Amino acid sequence: MKTIILNASPRKNWNTAQLLKEAQKGAESVGSEVEYIDLYDLNYTGCRSCLACKRKGAEPCKCYWKDDLSPLIDKILRANAVIIGSPIYFGEPTAQFRALYERLIFCIMSYDSHANNFNGKVNVGLIYTMNAPKNYFEAAMHPTYNTTESLMGFLGGKVMTYASCDTVQVADYSKYDMSAFSEEAKKAHHDAQFPLDLQAAFNMGADLSK
């Protein structure tokens, strides 16, 4: 088994990364080989609409744009599982997440039938972190991500989503202009909830990598 874990956060050691590293431990606990990648270290953009993947005679399920993302897409399509983590900014995952998502899905989608050219099976895990409370995420935000989850199903495996909500943004709020947030309340919630989030990420890594 091969599991690829992708950090779509610019922060390499904060909430999203911590959850992904627990997912890595979960994958490793069931014997999967894991490759962990920080997407912000790579040089790539979103889809350039070159349409090379749609040309007659083109190899199916291949992104032809020459940058750091195309070989990663090849790796994902050869893996057994991919777990992607992203913070939510203004209600959406990061630009790095979006660029990966649109290029990955577009290169496997048929423009003859809008069907799926990919015949493999890659399980997908999506981990989101955000300042919003859980009830707001479930009522107002999660429904907007249904398209993402549905299209990730083109990879042929199961798709799991987990949201870590009302997260702590910084270690010391006194150093920042963030008076809209209660540091005491944030940290109390973090101390109670984040260990559960870490366990959920571990379980996701194990479940998707079996």
Language-model features, listed with the residues they occupy:
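N-terminal beta1-alpha1-beta2 submodule of the flavodoxin-like/Rossmannoid cofactor-binding fold
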Residues: 1-113, 178-210
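Cofactor-binding loop segments of dinucleotide-utilizing enzymes, especially the Rossmann-like FAD-
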Residues: 8, 39, 127-129, 164
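Short aromatic-enriched loop/helix-cap "lid" or pocket-rim segments at secondary-structure transitions
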Residues: 47-49, 138-139, 171-176
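Membrane-targeting and insertion segments and their boundary/processing signals
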Residues: 70-74, 122, 171-175
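Short, catalytically relevant binding-site loops at active-site mouths
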Residues: 89-91, 132-133, 168
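Short, glycine-/small-residue-rich phosphate/pyrophosphate-handling segment
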Residues: 95-96, 108-162
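Beta-strand-loop-alpha "switch" segments that mediate conformational coupling across diverse proteins
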Residues: 160-171
